[in-house]
Amino acid sequence: MDYEIRQAEKRNIAGFHMVGPWEKTVKQGFEQLMMWVDGNQVVPLEWIAVYYDNPDEVPAEKLRCDTVVSVPDNFTIPKNSEGVILTEIAGGQYATAVARVENHDFATPWYQFFNSLLQDNHYQIAAKPCFEVYLNNGTEDGYWDIEMYVPVQSK
C-alpha cells in the first residue's frame, strides 16, 4: 500500500469513548455521535475514529476507541451532553494512506497499511493511538473513503 510520512497538527476532538469489539462499538459510537452533533448544532471539522489497541494483542471486549468530531480550539461541550469527552489527538509524525472501504470491511485496508509500514527501513510504528478520518458519508455513498494515520518514529 502506498503511504507518505508527514507532520500532522494536533486535533481537538469531542465525542464518545467506547470499549468492546470494534465491529459493534464504532457503529454504535457514530450513531450516538450523529445524534449529539445534530441535537446540539455542533459543526464538525472532521469525523474521526481513534483506535487505542492492537486487536491482535487485546481481547475484543477490551478494545478501546473514540468516535469523535474534530472541533475548534475554543470549543466547549454543550449542556446536556452526557458521556461526551473533549480531548485531543497529538500532533507529530504520521504515516498516512487513503483507502476505500467497501462491504464494511475496515480491517483489510488497516492490515495492508500495517504490513507495508512494518517493511519500512526508515520508520517504525510509535506507541500512540492510530486514527482514521472519514472523507465522505459512507451511509449515503455505500462505501467509505478514509485517510488512515499511524504514528511513526525514525528507526
From Swiss-Prot:
The keyword Cytoplasm applies. SMART domains: AraC_E_bind (SM00871). GO terms for molecular function: DNA topoisomerase type II (double strand cut, ATP-hydrolyzing) inhibitor activity. Pfam families: GyrI-like. Its main location: cytoplasm. Keywords: Cytoplasm, Stress response. Signal peptide: none annotated. GO terms for cellular component: cytoplasm. It is found in: Cytoplasm. Inhibits the supercoiling activity of DNA gyrase. Acts by inhibiting DNA gyrase at an early step, prior to (or at the step of) binding of DNA by the gyrase. It protects cells against toxins that target DNA gyrase, by inhibiting activity of these toxins and reducing the formation of lethal double-strand breaks in the cell. Interacts with DNA gyrase. Belongs to the DNA gyrase inhibitor family. This is DNA gyrase inhibitor. It comes from Citrobacter koseri (strain ATCC BAA-895 / CDC 4225-83 / SGSC4696).
